Amino acid sequence: MKIGIIGAMDEEVSILKAKLNNMETTIIAGCEFYQGELNGKQVILTKSGIGKVAAAVATTLLLERFNPGQVINTGSAGGYDTTLNVGDIVISTEVRFHDVDLTAFGYEIGQMAQLPAAFPADKNLIFAAQKAAETITHLKTIQGLICTGDIFMADPTKAEIARHNFPTMAACEMEAAAIAQVCYQFKVPFVIIRSLSDIAGKKSELSFEQYLPIAAKNASILVEEIINNLN
């Protein structure tokens, strides 16, 4: 079974890309797809671009053109869980949009019309991620809610609004829920793996620039170990 891996930026895919054997590159609509073998497994590594629309386009193309059996999203995020620090990892239990508001029509905050309020990650992939995390003892990993919006949470006021609306949110970023929605509509299992590059609302733009390489590396380490453990 082929495994799809999606990252938004060069920094988030470059480590895994460097490890691909027999790599073939395809570019469609600005999205970059790298087919190859990672530790004996067939993978399609995808660089989507940043934000929800870019992620949705890339995920749709990935599923339509390359037909992976499961999808793993790797990358960085802003932290909300108070027990976490930069470099720690969140494995998604479910994913929601934090910048959607159709409550005037009776939907939950974050719920898009005619869709579920949350997109649950695949239980088998969560289990595989947790088992992989247990073998990487130098990385702290938790499971939790990841929320998505086209906002970089540098503004403490905006960060606090998101915290109020989603009090159990562990991390916040800009692609995961779009990837999750496409996987939900295609009925393809997914899991999101995000390492913290910053803490939302606390000069996070400065932290992001400094710690993105660390976050990208840590997420890539876990994703590679997950793939090693998948049948």
UniProtKB/Swiss-Prot annotation:
Q: Name one GO biological process term.
A: L-methionine salvage from S-adenosylmethionine
Superkingdom of the source species: Bacteria
The pathway to which it is assigned is: Amino-acid biosynthesis; L-methionine biosynthesis via salvage pathway; S-methyl-5-thio-alpha-D-ribose 1-phosphate from S-methyl-5'-thioadenosine (hydrolase route): step 1/2
Q: Does the keyword Amino-acid biosynthesis apply?
A: yes
In terms of Pfam families, this protein maps to: PNP_UDP_1
Q: Which GO terms describe its cellular component?
A: cytosol
**Entry-linked InterPro entries:** MTA_SAH_Nsdase, Nucleoside_phosphorylase_d, Nucleoside_phosphorylase_sf
Specify the enzyme's EC class, one word. hydrolase
Q: Which positions in this protein are listed as binding substrate?
A: 78, 153, 174-175
What keywords would UniProt list here? Amino-acid biosynthesis, Hydrolase, Methionine biosynthesis
Record-listed E.C. numbers:
3.2.2.9
Which residues does UniProt call coiled coil? none
One Gene Ontology MF term: adenosylhomocysteine nucleosidase activity
Where does the record place the catalytic residues?
A: 12, 198
The reactions it catalyses are: S-adenosyl-L-homocysteine + H2O = S-(5-deoxy-D-ribos-5-yl)-L-homocysteine + adenine; S-methyl-5'-thioadenosine + H2O = 5-(methylsulfanyl)-D-ribose + adenine; 5'-deoxyadenosine + H2O = 5-deoxy-D-ribose + adenine
The record's listing under HAMAP family reads: Salvage_MtnN
What is known about what this protein does?
Catalyzes the irreversible cleavage of the glycosidic bond in both 5'-methylthioadenosine (MTA) and S-adenosylhomocysteine (SAH/AdoHcy) to adenine and the corresponding thioribose, 5'-methylthioribose and S-ribosylhomocysteine, respectively. Also cleaves 5'-deoxyadenosine, a toxic by-product of radical S-adenosylmethionine (SAM) enzymes, into 5-deoxyribose and adenine.
Which family does the entry's similarity section mention? Belongs to the PNP/UDP phosphorylase family. MtnN subfamily.
The protein's name is 5'-methylthioadenosine/S-adenosylhomocysteine nucleosidase
Species for this entry: Psychromonas ingrahamii (strain DSM 17664 / CCUG 51855 / 37)
* Taxonomic lineage: Bacteria, Pseudomonadati, Pseudomonadota, Gammaproteobacteria, Alteromonadales
